[in-house]
Swiss-Prot record:
InterPro entries attached to this UniProt entry: Ribosomal_uL18_bac-type, Ribosomal_uL18_bac/euk
Pfam annotation, one family: Ribosomal_L18p
Keyword rRNA-binding: yes
GO MF annotation list: 5S rRNA binding; structural constituent of ribosome
Protein keywords: Ribonucleoprotein, Ribosomal protein, RNA-binding, rRNA-binding
Identification of the protein by name: Large ribosomal subunit protein uL18
Family: Belongs to the universal ribosomal protein uL18 family.
GO process terms (BP): translation
Stored SUPFAM superfamilies: Translational machinery components (SSF53137)
Organism listed in the record: Chromobacterium violaceum (strain ATCC 12472 / DSM 30191 / JCM 1249 / CCUG 213 / NBRC 12614 / NCIMB 9131 / NCTC 9757 / MK)
GO CC list: cytosolic large ribosomal subunit
Role description: This is one of the proteins that bind and probably mediate the attachment of the 5S RNA into the large ribosomal subunit, where it forms part of the central protuberance.
C-alpha cells in the first residue's frame, strides 16, 4: 500500500467508528494549497456548515491558504458557523491525516471558539 491508500484506510476506520456513535462530525480535508472543514450530520448525508480557505473573505485576508495560520482561521470560522447552526459537540474526523501542524491548528482554534470534541 502506498501513503495515500494507507491514509484513506485510516479515514474509513475513523468514519465507521463515528457512524457507530451517531454523532455530528467535523470533517477536515487538506491539500497543499488549501484546507476545508465541514460539519456533517449523523447520517452522513447533509452538510450543516462549512468553511474553507477558498472563501472570498478568507482568501482576501490570507496570502496562502495552505499554512497553519489559514487553518486556525478556518477553525475559528467553522466553530462560529456551527454555533450559529446550534451545534456544540462534534466528533473530529481528520480524514486519516496526522494530528499535527494544520490539523492541530484547526482543531485548537475550533475548540477555543466553542466546539467540544
Amino acid at each position: 500500500m502506498d501513503k495515500k491508500q494507507t491514509r484513506l484506510r485510516r479515514a474509513r476506520k475513523t468514519r465507521a467508528r463515528i457512524a457507530e456513535l451517531k454523532m455530528v462530525r467535523l470533517s477536515v480535508h487538506r491539500t497543499n494549497s488549501h484546507i476545508y472543514a465541514q460539519i456533517i450530520d449523523e447520517t452522513g448525508n447533509k452538510v450543516l456548515a462549512s468553511a474553507s480557505s477558498l472563501e472570498a473573505d478568507v482568501r482576501s485576508a490570507m496570502a496562502n491558504g495552505g499554512n497553519v495560520a489559514a487553518a486556525a482561521v478556518i477553525g475559528k470560522r467553522i466553530a462560529e458557523k456551527a454555533k450559529a447552526a446550534g451545534i456544540e459537540q462534534v466528533a473530529f474526523d481528520r480524514s486519516g491525516f496526522k494530528y499535527h501542524g494544520r490539523m492541530k491548528a484547526l482543531a485548537d482554534a475550533a475548540r477555543e471558539h466553542g466546539l467540544v470534541f
